[in-house]
């Protein structure tokens, strides 16, 4: 068996991303300063190459697996910063995630919160003020006076990586489309010889040694060693990467390396040969792949480029069943199963096409509990992917009496510590859990510590980004048709109404609706009102 996606994606994405020599096409009115953010026009061009979202998700998988020190991602990050990856705090255009301690943290935040097209912007205050050491000193003080926002200043950066820009290739879009097409292939035919020769020339400068990538990840906090490693890596060829791809395409010996599927080797050890004995799954795995390709907005790109299905003999549809199943297991194990498009497609296929229905039961007499939209299905699939014996899904009947939730699902939930409440159409009440703590705790902390508290701001940021819907996804409207200038004021109002046994939810902002816009001054009054009411409540209880 060929190596799974974990080993394939890095090699493939090196081919995918290297042609992106961005160049950062300079606006006629503004020169590109090394280390500065891209202009709106440059970002538009940059993000066009990562649209639709499944393209951005492909790069995020590589970042999650190999970290920011991966040479391919270093190059991509250089492009986004006019050649220099800043060493220190950076700012973004996200309303409640306005700055990050590093550009790497910013990119991880975009991926983990699915805001793939958030932009880096110039900071409105000096970078030194936003540095981690300064923040620790501020937090240690008894009281913090608000910082006056100043006009944007010229960026100050220290260099971790540098690159000389090349013009945007004329064939850039075509190359990216072609290579992204290949990203859906796991072990397909080799590319045309002349194309591989071209890659060999263009990619001669790319470092690909995996042990250096891992070494860079383990020593991210040691900047000097990182820079030294980066220099040592420069000038390396892509011979190893090409050999890895070739091995994936030609190796017919069934092999499985669990360590390539998970950072914890013992956490994922499926026996694919055992799963082969599950005929309902194996015989319909190709139908699942088709379904997965058509949901979550991926149908648009496939409708426009339907020739991919017919002309790409290395696509998932042509994979042997065991390998396709391995890819699916990898997707739900390495990510949070209940929020993955893979799980949604898989669930749809088994419910609608295979006829299992909504309830989820297995051959051990267990009935998997539906504590959230995909919890029962993910509970079963995580068990199947990890199982050393044959575990089959069955249609539920009276013989399935044991309620069950996989501990593997619980461990995934604990790793993020957040739980989204039951969704309503166009509405969002908030996270049931954040950091393992309920909303009442966070409302209380908001009232006592304020919006600027580090933990409170993290809660607000996560909630804000958990719901982006409507004509204006980044604006904040509620079910009383009030529009708020910031998320803290909305959450204060929601906590206030919750304390009065009245439910107010965030609602998508629509173009054809009229809202009462809250001024910044009024929004501060809302925050203060909740703080005062909470203080009165606690004084009444304890005094």
UniProtKB/Swiss-Prot annotation:
User: Could you tell me the keywords of this UniProt record?
Assistant: Cytoplasmic vesicle, Phosphoprotein, Secreted, Signal
Q: List the propeptide residues.
A: 26-273
Where does tissue-level expression of this protein occur? Expression restricted to testis in normal tissue. Expressed in a wide spectrum of cancers, including bladder, breast, liver, lung and colon cancers.
Q: Glycoprotein: is it a keyword of this entry?
A: no
Q: Which GO terms describe its biological process?
A: acrosome assembly; fertilization; spermatid development
Per the record, which residues fall in region Pro-ACR binding? 26-106, 319-427
Which InterPro entries does this UniProt record tie to the protein? Kazal_dom_sf, Proacrosin-bd
Tell me where in or outside the cell this protein is found. Secreted; Cytoplasmic vesicle, Secretory vesicle, Acrosome
Hey, what's the signal peptide range on this chain? 1-25
Compositionally biased region (Basic and acidic residues): 192-220, 232-243
Which portions of the sequence form the region Disordered?
Answer: 185-272
User: How is the protein modified post-translationally, according to the record?
Assistant: Phosphorylated on Tyr residues in capacitated sperm.
PANTHER family reported in the protein's UniProt record: ACROSIN-BINDING PROTEIN
Protein name (record): Acrosin-binding protein
């Amino acid at each position: 068996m060929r190596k799974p996606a974990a080993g394939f994606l890095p090699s493939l994405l090196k081919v995918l991303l290297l042609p992106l020599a961005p160049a950062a096409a300079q606006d006629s009115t503004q020169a590109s300063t090394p280390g500065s953010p891209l202009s709106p026009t440059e970002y538009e061009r940059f993000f066009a190459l990562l649209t639709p979202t499944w393209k951005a998700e492909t790069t995020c998988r590589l970042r999650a697996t190999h970290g920011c020190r991966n040479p391919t991602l270093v190059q991509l990050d250089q492009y986004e910063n006019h050649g220099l990856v800043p060493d220190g705090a950076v700012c973004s255009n996200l309303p409640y995630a306005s700055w990050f301690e590093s550009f790497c943290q910013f990119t991880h935040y975009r991926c983990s919160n699915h805001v793939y097209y958030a932009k880096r912007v110039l900071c409105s205050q000096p970078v030194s003020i936003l540095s981690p050491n300064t923040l620790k000193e501020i937090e240690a003080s008894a009281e913090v006076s608000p910082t006056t926002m100043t006009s944007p200043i010229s960026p100050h950066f220290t260099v971790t990586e540098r690159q000389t820009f090349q013009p945007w290739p004329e064939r850039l879009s075509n190359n990216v489309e072609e290579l992204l097409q290949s990203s859906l292939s796991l072990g397909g035919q080799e590319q045309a010889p002349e194309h591989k020769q071209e890659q060999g020339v263009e990619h001669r400068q790319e470092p690909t040694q995996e042990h250096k990538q891992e070494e860079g990840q383990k020593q991210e906090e040691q900047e000097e060693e990182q820079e030294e490693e980066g220099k040592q890596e420069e000038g390396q060829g892509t011979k190893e990467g090409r050999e890895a791809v070739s091995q994936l395409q030609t190796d017919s010996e069934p092999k499985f390396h669990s360590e390539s599927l998970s950072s914890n080797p013992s956490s994922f050890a499926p026996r694919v040969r055992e799963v082969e004995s599950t005929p309902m799954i194996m015989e319909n795995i190709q139908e699942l792949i088709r379904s997965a390709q058509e949901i979550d907005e991926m149908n648009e790109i496939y409708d426009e480029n339907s020739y991919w299905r017919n002309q790409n003999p290395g696509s998932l549809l042509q994979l042997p069943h065991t390998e396709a199943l391995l890819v699916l297991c990898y997707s739900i194990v390495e990510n949070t199963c209940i929020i993955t498009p893979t799980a949604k497609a898989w669930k749809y296929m088994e419910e609608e096409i295979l006829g299992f229905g909504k309830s989820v039961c297995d051959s051990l007499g267990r009935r998997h509990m539906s504590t959230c939209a995909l919890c029962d299905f993910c509970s079963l699939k995580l068990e199947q992917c990890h199982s050393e014996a044959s575990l089959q899904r069955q249609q539920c009947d009276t013989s399935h009496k044991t309620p069950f939730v996989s501990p593997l699902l619980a461990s995934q939930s604990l790793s993020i510590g957040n739980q989204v409440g039951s969704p309503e159409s166009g509405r969002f009440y908030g996270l049931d859990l954040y950091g393992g703590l309920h909303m009442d705790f966070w409302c209380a902390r908001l009232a006592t510590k304020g919006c600027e508290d580090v933990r409170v701001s993290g809660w607000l940021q996560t909630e804000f980004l958990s719901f982006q819907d409507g004509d204006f996804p980044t604006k904040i409207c509620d079910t009383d048709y009030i529009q708020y200038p910031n998320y803290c004021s909305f959450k204060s109002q929601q906590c206030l109404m919750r304390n009065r046994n009245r439910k107010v939810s965030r609602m998508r902002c629509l173009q054809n609706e009229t809202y009462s816009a809250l001024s910044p001054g009024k929004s501060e009054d809302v925050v203060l009102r909740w703080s005062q009411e909470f203080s009165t409540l606690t004084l009444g209880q304890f005094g």
